[in-house]
From Swiss-Prot:
Subcellular location(s) of the protein: Cytoplasm
Organism lineage string: Bacteria, Pseudomonadati, Pseudomonadota, Gammaproteobacteria, Alteromonadales
Function: Catalyzes the ATP-dependent transfer of a sulfur to tRNA to produce 4-thiouridine in position 8 of tRNAs, which functions as a near-UV photosensor. Also catalyzes the transfer of sulfur to the sulfur carrier protein ThiS, forming ThiS-thiocarboxylate. This is a step in the synthesis of thiazole, in the thiamine biosynthesis pathway. The sulfur is donated as persulfide by IscS.
Family from the record: Belongs to the ThiI family.
Pfam families reported in the protein's UniProt record: Rhodanese, ThiI, ThiI_fer, THUMP
One GO CC term on file: cytosol
Domain of life, source organism: Bacteria
Single GO molecular function: tRNA-uracil-4 sulfurtransferase activity
Matches recorded under InterPro entries: Rhodanese-like_dom, Rhodanese-like_dom_sf, Rossmann-like_a/b/a_fold, ThiI_AANH, ThiI_fer, ThiI_N, THII_Thiazole_biosynth_dom, THUMP_dom
Catalytic activity of the protein: [ThiI sulfur-carrier protein]-S-sulfanyl-L-cysteine + a uridine in tRNA + 2 reduced [2Fe-2S]-[ferredoxin] + ATP + H(+) = [ThiI sulfur-carrier protein]-L-cysteine + a 4-thiouridine in tRNA + 2 oxidized [2Fe-2S]-[ferredoxin] + AMP + diphosphate; [ThiS sulfur-carrier protein]-C-terminal Gly-Gly-AMP + S-sulfanyl-L-cysteinyl-[cysteine desulfurase] + AH2 = [ThiS sulfur-carrier protein]-C-terminal-Gly-aminoethanethioate + L-cysteinyl-[cysteine desulfurase] + A + AMP + 2 H(+)
Gene from which this protein is expressed: thiI
Official protein name in the record: tRNA sulfurtransferase
Domain THUMP: 63-167
Organism: Shewanella sp. (strain W3-18-1)
Keywords recorded for this protein, A-Z: ATP-binding, Cytoplasm, Disulfide bond, Nucleotide-binding, Redox-active center, RNA-binding, Thiamine biosynthesis, Transferase, tRNA-binding
Length: 484
């Protein structure tokens, strides 16, 4: 069993050297991701596609491989195929007949062939021969070239025949690390999660900068979002997570800055700080989730004033998107429930915020800040490899909160994503196991029986620790981590 990875069309349009570089990078990215699923994964690059071989002795890995490939940037689509050898067009038909006989019974169908190599026949010859045979010797209703019930997809590569058993749509975009790095300002809400995803999809290693206004609980929630985005869509490369203690800045704004200018000044201070951090990391652009007119600080005038605080490029991929479209996209990429449960920390709320800030007036207000405020904030910022989030959680969860045995009145909650749970169900004899995906746990935990203790389970223990810590920070004491 194999997967044939089709490159995103924009990659195919590149010049030969660029196309080769992109394809080689995509091959490396796929290998990095799939090796974490199974060390026996084999990946082979060709000119216009990449072949992924499922180990013959581990056919059960096909589903896991397919799910990972669907989330790797740079892929148009993936087809799962079975491989056969052939010597003639009749060989192709004879091997297709038992595979598709039952699938097309009582249905209309057509045959589509893609061919590579030198043969004494063309693709249309194969389509006619195989289609005619299937039409004559099966219980199919007949051939329909437009909108058939079943499409028989065959790929011929020299002396190999591939019968397509499944098609998986990819993310599109460019392979990770083919573009330069960006630093995304992430708050855990709908907008910043989607804007971060947009640049991951575009092939930019996306690092995260979080301005902490709400203490440990807020930071834990945002780390969950960042970790989910990285783990799902960008796992092939290491990225940084930077946490900036921003309460001192908010305190000075509330104490010293004119009420109407607070929102714009806050954003300018964030951009200044993020720019300093980006330069320290060798990053040339910031990414924000701002959308035109969504709030008072996001008018064109105010965005222009905000941009004047730094020479660093500020990118806003959501600038023309409607809020509902952003929410819909967050649902699709798996960050919606995180955003719904994220506490709102509006550290600076202006009663009459300006929508037409004047640069000179804003700069005059900013002179009221302590001279070394930004220096202090940048010095106190904590930068970690996003993979260290798991280790960080280990130091914050005590031994009594991590268990390997289950006692009476304890319920296990399997928080894995639905596709993971279906692939490898968790069944424990004599123990109640609830299935609540990690991205819904924060909103559903309050509805559970408070008299019981809940043990959170996931495959590697990372997300279960994050979720447990988040719930503990919210005041729940009946939650532990289950690590059998």
């Amino acid at each position: 069993m194999k997967f044939i990875v089709k490159l995103y069309p924009e990659i195919m349009m590149k010049s030969k050297p660029v196309r080769m570089r992109f394809t080689k990078m995509l091959e490396t990215n796929i290998r990095n991701v799939l090796k974490k699923v199974d060390e026996d994964a084999k990946v082979q690059r060709q000119w216009d596609r990449i072949m992924v071989m499922v180990p013959k002795h581990k056919p059960e890995l096909a589903q896991a491989f397919g799910e990972r490939l669907a989330c790797i940037p740079g892929i148009a689509h993936v087809v799962q195929v079975d491989e056969y050898s052939f010597e003639s067009v009749d060989d192709i038909y004879q091997q297709a007949l038992p595979v598709y006989r039952d699938q097309i019974a009582g249905k209309t169908f057509c045959v589509r062939v893609k061919r590579t190599g030198d043969h004494d026949f063309n693709s249309i010859d194969v389509e006619r021969y195989v289609g005619g045979g299937l039409n004559q010797f099966t219980d199919a209703i007949g051939v329909r070239l437009k909108n058939p019930d079943v499409t028989v997809n065959l790929e011929i590569d020299r002396d190999k025949l591939y019968m397509v058993t499944k098609r998986i749509e990819g993310l599109g975009g460019f392979p990770m690390a083919t573009q330069e790095d960006v630093l995304s300002l992430i708050s855990g809400g709908f907008d910043s999660g989607v804007s971060s995803y947009q640049f991951i999809k575009k092939g930019a290693r996306t690092h995260y900068c979080f301005f902490n206004l709400g203490g440990a609980q807020h930071e834990i929630g945002v780390k969950q979002v960042a970790y989910h985005l990285w783990k799902t869509y960008g796992e092939s490369h290491k990225v940084k997570f930077v946490s900036v203690p921003f309460e001192p800045v908010v305190a000075e704004i509330l104490e010293k800055i004119d009420n109407g200018q607070m929102g714009v000044v806050l954003k300018r201070m964030m951009m200044r700080t993020a720019a300093r951090i980006a330069e320290r990391l060798g990053i040339q652009a910031l990414v924000t989730g701002e959308s035109l007119g969504q709030v008072s600080s996001q008018t064109l005038t105010n965005l222009n004033v905000i941009d004047r605080c730094t020479e660093l490029l500020i990118l806003r991929p959501l600038i023309a998107m409607d809020k509902q479209d952003i929410i819909n996209e967050s649902r699709r990429i798996g960050t919606e429930d995180f955003a719904k449960s994220m506490p709102e920390y509006c550290g600076v709320i202006s009663q009459k915020p300006t929508v037409k800030a004047v640069l000179a007036k804003v700069e005059a207000e900013e002179k009221k800040f302590s001279e070394d405020l930004i220096d202090q904030i940048v010095a106190q910022a904590v930068t970690i490899d996003i993979r260290e989030i798991a280790e960080q959680m280990d130091t914050r969860i005590t031994e009594t909160e991590t268990v390997i045995a289950i006692e009476t009145n304890e319920v296990v909650i399997d928080i894995r994503a639905p596709e993971e749970e279906e692939h490898k169900p968790l069944n424990i004899e004599g123990v109640e196991v609830k299935r609540i995906p990690f991205f819904k746990l924060a909103t559903q935990f309050a509805d559970l029986d408070k008299q019981k203790t809940y043990l959170l389970y996931c495959e590697r223990g990372v997300m279960s620790k994050l979720q447990a810590l988040y719930l503990i920070e919210q005041g729940y004491t009946n939650v532990k981590v289950y690590r059998p």
